[in-house]
C-alpha cells in the first residue's frame, strides 16, 4: 500500500542500504561525513541522473528549490555544489563500483529466466566497449590521442535482461582485447564479440575454461579445411566447416580445431564469416548468436542518451569514475524496479516517468502500471530491427 512517500523515496526503498554501508566501510577515507554522508552523495548524484541535471550548480539549484522536501528524499546533509564536488573528488570511487556490482548481482537473479530471442539453455554474453570523449585540457589523466582525451567503458552484457555482468572503466588507450584477461569465463557460457577481440592465445584460454566464443573472422585468416558439414542454403548458410589455423603464430596460439560458418545476408548482399569453438549448435544458430551482439550496442546507445555519462560534474579520475558507477547503479536499480513490479513498460518509459514525478506523493507502483503499453496497441520492437545493422560490422 502507498504510504504517502515521495516517488524518489519509493524508488530508493529498493536500495539494499546494508550492502551500501558495507561498501562504505570497506574503503575508509579522511573526507568528513558527519554533515554530508556517502548516502547523501549517492542520492544527490542519483537525482542528477534521473532528472538530467547538467552541472553541479544545476543540482544545487534544483534541490534547494525543494529544500523542504530533502528530508523526505532521504537526504540529511546540506546541499552545496562545493560539498558535492569535494565528495566526488575525495571519496573512493570503488565504494560506488562495489555497490553497483552488488545491484547487478541482484538484477541478474531477477532476470535469469528471461528469454532474449533464442531458445538456449546456455548463458549468453555480448562483449564490447564504448569510448566517451573528454577534453584533454580538463582531463589530462585521460590521454587518448595527441589532442584528445577519452575513457572506455568495457562491458560484458548478460543478454537475459540486458544486465551488465562485468564492467571495466579504463583510459581510452587500452586495447579491447586486453579485457579478455580480466574476465572469469564461465564453463558452458557463450561469449559473443567482434573482430577487435581476436587474439588466438586468449581465445584458447577461453576454450580451455570450457566456455564458448562466437566472433567474426578477419579477412586475412589463414586456415586449412578439415571437413565440410552439410548445410541448407535456403537459410542463408553458405558453409559450415571444421578448420585448423595454418598461420605460424595463430597455429601455435590455438592448436585445436575451430568451426567456420559462412552466412549470406540477403538484405544487404553481404557474406559474413563467423568463428566459434562450439561444434554442437546448428550453424544457423551460430549466425543468430552473433546478431545478438547488437544488444550491447543498444545498451551503450541507451545509457549515453538517457543517463549523464557524457557531461561530467568533476574532472578528476575519481570524480569521473564515481559518476559513471552511480549512473550504472541507477540503470540497474530501475531494471530491478521494473522486474519487481512486474511491469511491461520499457526502462526508457519508466525513466521518463521518474524524471517528472520524483517530488510527487503518488504510488510508484500505480505510475509504472499505468505506463505499460496498451495490449490492444502492441509496441514495435527495436530489438529485432537492430539486427539488420549487422552489415555495418
Give the label of every model feature segment.
Residues 1-58, 62, 91, 98-99, ...:
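Single, function-defining residue in the core of a domain
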Residues 68-70:
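Active-site cofactor/substrate anionic-group-binding motifs, chiefly glycine-
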Residues 72-73, 112-114, 141-144, 180:
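Catalytic micro-motifs at enzyme active sites that drive phosphoryl/nucleotidyl and oxygen chemistry
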Residues 72-91, 101:
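Major-groove recognition helix of helix-turn-helix-like DNA-binding domains
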Residues 82-86, 107-111, 372-377:
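Short alpha-helical linear motifs
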Residues 95-107:
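Short Lys/Arg-enriched helix C-cap and helix-to-coil transition segments
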Residues 107-116, 177:
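A short, well-structured juxtamembrane/interface segment
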Amino acid at each position: 500500500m502507498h504510504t504517502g512517500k515521495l516517488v524518489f523515496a519509493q524508488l530508493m526503498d529498493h536500495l539494499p542500504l546494508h550492502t551500501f554501508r558495507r561498501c562504505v566501510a570497506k574503503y575508509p577515507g579522511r573526507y568528513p561525513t558527519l554533515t554530508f554522508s556517502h548516502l547523501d552523495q549517492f542520492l544527490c548524484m542519483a537525482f542528477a541522473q534521473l532528472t538530467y541535471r547538467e552541472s553541479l550548480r544545476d543540482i544545487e539549484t534544483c534541490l534547494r528549490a525543494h529544500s523542504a522536501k530533502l528530508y523526505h528524499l532521504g537526504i540529511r546533509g546540506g546541499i552545496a555544489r562545493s560539498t558535492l564536488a569535494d565528495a566526488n573528488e575525495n571519496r573512493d570511487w570503488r565504494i560506488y563500483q562495489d555497490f553497483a556490482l552488488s545491484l547487478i548481482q541482484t538484477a541478474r537473479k531477477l532476470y535469469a529466466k528471461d528469454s532474449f530471442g533464442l531458445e538456449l539453455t546456455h548463458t549468453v554474453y555480448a562483449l564490447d566497449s564504448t569510448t566517451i570523449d573528454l577534453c584533454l585540457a580538463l582531463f589530462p589523466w585521460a590521454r587518448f590521442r595527441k589532442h584528445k582525451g577519452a575513457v572506455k567503458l568495457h562491458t560484458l552484457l548478460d543478454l537475459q535482461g540486458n544486465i551488465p555482468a562485468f564492467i571495466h572503466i579504463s583510459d581510452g588507450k587500452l586495447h579491447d582485447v586486453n579485457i579478455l584477461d580480466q574476465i572469469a569465463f564461465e564453463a558452458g557460457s557463450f561469449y559473443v564479440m567482434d573482430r577487435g577481440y581476436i587474439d588466438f592465445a586468449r581465445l584458447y584460454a577461453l576454450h580451455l575454461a570450457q566456455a564458448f566464443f562466437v566472433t567474426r573472422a578477419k579477412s586475412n585468416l589463414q586456415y586449412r579445411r578439415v571437413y565440410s558439414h552439410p548445410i541448407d542454403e535456403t537459410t542463408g548458410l553458405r558453409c559450415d566447416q571444421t578448420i585448423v589455423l595454418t598461420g605460424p603464430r595463430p597455429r601455435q596460439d590455438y592448436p585445436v580445431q575451430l568451426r567456420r560458418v559462412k552466412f549470406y545476408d540477403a538484405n544487404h548482399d553481404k557474406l559474413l564469416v563467423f568463428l566459434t569453438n562450439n561444434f554442437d549448435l546448428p550453424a544457423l544458430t551460430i549466425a543468430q548468436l552473433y546478431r545478438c551482439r547488437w544488444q550491447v550496442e543498444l545498451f551503450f546507445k541507451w545509457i549515453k542518451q538517457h543517463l549523464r555519462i557524457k557531461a561530467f560534474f568533476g574532472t578528476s579520475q575519481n570524480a569521473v569514475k564515481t559518476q559513471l558507477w552511480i549512473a550504472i547503479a541507477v540503470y540497474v536499480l530501475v531494471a530491478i524496479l521494473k522486474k519487481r513490479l512486474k511491469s511491461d513498460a520499457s526502462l526508457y518509459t519508466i525513466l521518463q516517468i521518474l524524471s517528472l514525478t520524483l517530488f510527487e506523493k503518488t504510488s510508484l507502483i500505480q505510475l509504472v502500471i499505468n505506463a505499460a503499453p496498451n495490449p490492444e496497441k502492441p509496441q514495435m520492437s527495436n530489438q529485432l530491427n537492430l539486427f539488420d545493422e549487422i552489415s555495418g560490422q
